[in-house]
């Protein structure tokens, strides 16, 4: 059943606009949304995500990829798209980055009673959702990921730079949490350097 229109224009919201650098756990429902919109006469959709930042963390690029496929085929398989994205976007670093992504998803799922599902909510940044030990542990994942792609540094510098950039983008989120939520765990000089490094990477990535 439809709404009697075959030319429905839709503007959807896809991230937490109060917590812009945090992952928003809607990856798995994007395709379902497209199916729903199509059923009710959707003809055009503008999925508003991180449009202000070129390279936002929280797997925004995965969301963009799923959207790009779902707009042309609402019956695309979510798991296949995720597998393909990680395979080609991270290459040899895919296993460790997929593990990190899965852990983020699980963590958000078990804490939905705290975060809620609204795009305008401060609950997503609640310290109970992101314990310091968990966030700190994730930083090692990016070091491992960078080591996995080192072989391209001398054989294919262009590919190496692209893959290294992809990993760096995702490292922004846990670094941001440590810089803003757990600054008291570091000395004044340490947190100053951490924030300086974060800001440089954030801006160098075109954000």
Residue ranges and their predicted role:
Residues 1-95, 99, 106:
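Structured mid-domain segments that build the active-site/substrate or prosthetic-cofactor binding neighborhood
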Residues 40-42, 67-207:
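Catalytic domains of carbohydrate-active enzymes that cleave complex glycans
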């Amino acid at each position: 059943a439809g709404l009697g229109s075959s030319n429905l224009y839709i503007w959807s919201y896809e991230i937490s606009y109060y917590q812009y650098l945090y992952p928003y756990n809607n990856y798995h429902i994007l395709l379902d949304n497209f199916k729903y919109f199509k059923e009710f006469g959707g003809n055009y959709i503008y999925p508003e995500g991180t449009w202000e930042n070129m390279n936002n963390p929280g797997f925004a690029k995965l969301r963009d990829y799923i959207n790009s496929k779902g707009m042309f085929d609402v019956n695309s398989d979510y798991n296949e798209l995720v597998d393909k994205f990680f395979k080609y976007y991270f290459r040899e670093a895919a296993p460790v980055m997929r593990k990190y992504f899965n852990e983020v998803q699980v963590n958000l799922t078990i804490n939905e009673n705290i975060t809620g599902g609204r795009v305008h909510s401060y609950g997503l940044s609640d310290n109970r959702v992101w314990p310091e030990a968990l966030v700190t542990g994730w930083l090692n994942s990016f070091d491992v990921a960078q080591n996995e792609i080192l072989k391209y540094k001398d054989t294919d510098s262009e590919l190496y730079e692209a893959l290294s950039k992809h990993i760096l983008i995702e490292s922004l989120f846990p670094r941001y949490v440590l810089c803003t939520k757990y600054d008291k765990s570091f000395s004044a000089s340490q947190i100053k350097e951490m924030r300086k490094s974060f800001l440089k990477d954030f801006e160098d990535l075109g954000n």
